[in-house]
Regions:
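An aromatic/glycine/proline-enriched structural segment found at the starts
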Residues: 31-47, 215, 252-310, 314-315
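Signal peptide processing junction and immediate N-terminal pro/mature segment
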Residues: 21-34, 108
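A structural supersecondary motif
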Residues: 94, 134-138, 312, 337-376
């Protein structure tokens, strides 16, 4: 494959789709979580999701923050009946790793899913299977550059199954099975994942990342890590990583399903309220900004892969207050992008010089605000 991306500091008006209602981002900074009265005074404490925002509060969600800093959000959703979904997000991903810890966030995900010191190794999986949970579809986890999310869907949720599941999850987060045996067992798994993922698309993705984000942590910190750092992992190193990042103040829990919100809230308080982490947590590192002086182009050859061209306009990523005006501007930008992509699609259908083309905007892992144009030429 010939790959020729281009870097520019040009500023374009575009949009990243609003992350509305994403479970892992919902919570509130007060111990008690009472449904919000839309007619309350302006002095009311707004849920943390709505801090510095004038977006109307969704009163269907019950927000709260425990005294240990853990944030949560719960709501009733009776469709489909009898089912409950739990999401737990830990604010640690590959970008939080030190140079000699590459792959540790993903490694920790594997260790955490094995169980805890209160549940025999591997027993949590068997318990959930008895509750009708299918591993992979109903129970899974994912590590990204900026976070680790644990997902559990209970197809036949009862008070007993919810209580058991929340107890297991709390133990996994606070006291996972980190010992020489579990670290060695999961090392074989993550190294196998790395070997299996080392295909053409993975190499193209790595080349993209190294070029576009040169000089930034994102360029070289893929969640899967490196062979050297994975082989060097020990129980002591993984325990130190866990203590730095797996902390209640870095945790957000969301529960949605056929459940009374008051019961869901109490389950969180009962199982996570006493969680304390030793020492002091680590500060979020600086993710850097795109370097306008970095090389503008790169050609990457991958045999057997169709020729494509990617151009990127990269700007520093900055957080924005989630206001109504901000979202209106994002909507305008989204429409503009859709218009451009539609015209590119029509040009391709009428026999243009390319088979496919599209444009999109991405806020990339808190590292860049980018506009990307992708083209597959016709010859």
């Amino acid at each position: 494959m010939r790959f020729s991306p281009r870097r520019s500091a040009a500023s374009l008006l575009i949009l990243s789709l609003l992350l509305a209602g994403a479970p892992q981002t919902l919570a509130q900074p007060q111990q008690t979580a009472t449904p919000v009265d839309q007619g309350a005074s302006k002095a009311q404490v707004r849920p943390w999701l709505y801090e510095n925002s004038d977006v109307p509060i969704d009163a269907a969600w019950r927000f709260g923050t425990l005294s240990n800093g853990l944030r949560y959000a719960v709501r009733r959703n009776g469709v489909p009946p009898g089912q409950v979904s739990i999401r737990l997000r830990m604010d640690v991903g590959s970008l939080m790793e030190r140079a000699d810890e590459q792959g540790y966030a993903h490694y920790m995900e594997h260790l955490t899913m094995r169980g805890s010191r209160h549940v025999p190794d591997g027993e949590s999986k068997r318990i959930w299977q008895r509750l009708g949970v299918t591993f992979g579809s109903d129970s899974n986890a994912q590590t990204t550059p900026t976070g680790t999310t644990y997902a559990l869907d209970l197809p036949q949720a009862t008070q007993a199954s919810l209580t058991e599941s929340m107890k297991i999850l709390a133990g996994m987060m606070a006291e996972p099975n980190i010992n020489a045996g579990s670290v060695d067992a999961e090392r074989a798994v993550v190294l196998a994942e790395k070997r299996e993922s080392d295909g053409p698309q993975s190499r193209i993705s790595d080349a993209n990342r190294l070029h576009f984000f040169a000089g930034q942590p994102l360029a070289e910190h893929a969640p899967i890590g490196t062979v050297d750092t994975l082989k060097a992992a020990t129980a002591a190193k993984m325990e130190a990583f866990h203590q730095r990042w797996y902390r209640p103040e870095n945790t957000v829990i969301a529960i949605s399903g056929d459940i009374d919100p008051a019961i869901a809230e109490q389950l969180i308080k009962d199982n996570f309220g006493n969680w304390t982490a030793p020492g002091k947590g680590a500060a979020i590192p600086d993710f850097g900004a795109p370097d306008p002086k970095a090389p503008a182009t790169r050609v990457f050859v991958e045999p057997g892969v169709p020729v494509s061209l990617t151009m990127a306009w990269l700007r520093p990523w900055t957080p924005h207050a989630d206001t109504i005006v901000y979202n209106q501007d994002k909507l305008t930008d989204m429409l503009a992008l859709q218009i451009v992509s539609r015209r590119l699609e029509q040009a391709a259908r009428t026999g243009g010089s390319f088979l496919q083309a599209s444009v999109e905007q991405q806020d990339v892992s808190r590292s860049a605000d980018g506009t990307f144009l992708s083209i597959i030429p016709s010859n």
